[in-house]
């Protein structure tokens, strides 16, 4: 399922969302800024999320993490490569031969595969809060964040309980000094729950991340212009990952954003919006 925000004559920008995120998670102020700058944002629900195709296996969150750390093979219904192929099929369906791509978190991992495998299809790549290696104790989420992510796998929670745990998570992984527990945010979470009630897709997407392993060799072959945006206090994907990506991608620029966690709150977006548009403008 996708949403083409237009305008029709704008330069297409494919937006690839992260783990457990629906297309509605892209901030409206970011969408508007892209449109106002002459771009045509196109967002979509990754498989197993939102209104896109669902799979049926029921892996457990903790068992997959334990298997990964113990180097035990992880069974997943699909890999990140399959999710990248979904994006290519969407571009083909929309008759888009070439576009920009912006990937957030897991969406950045998917986008790395996209631009490495299909460099002729993309003007530029923007990586936000993502990584090249598979998450591990040295570069991945803190134990506290893992516990909060694990809560999402709990079944039979009420709608209000799910909203409360979303507030706990974003308050932990977002920028400091920002009130995430607002009526507006709680309403947005409630609408997302109503749009897509199944949380098992989140666990299957996590299995795809852990089962794909790292992409060091593939990412080192990326040649298209790349902008790497990362928060200096990101507790989910540690800042060191941004420097690693920058080192591997020869044609890349690195922008570390002060007091940015793993979210794009409006004050955070205001800190990098000019650099983002400049990156897109000079690589059309």
Task: Label every model-predicted segment.
Residues 1-70:
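Conserved HGGG/HGGXW glycine-rich cap/lid loop of the alpha/beta-hydrolase fold
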Residues 252-284:
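Catalytic active-site module of serine/aspartate enzymes centered on a nucleophile-bearing elbow/loop
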Residues 97-137:
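Conserved hydrolase catalytic core segment
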Residues 224, 238-245:
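Short alpha-helix in the alpha/beta-hydrolase fold that links the catalytic acid
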Residues 141-217, 224:
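Alpha/beta-hydrolase
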Residues 81-99:
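Conserved acidic catalytic loop of the alpha/beta-hydrolase fold
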Residues 222, 228-230:
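Short beta-strand/loop motif that positions the catalytic acidic residue
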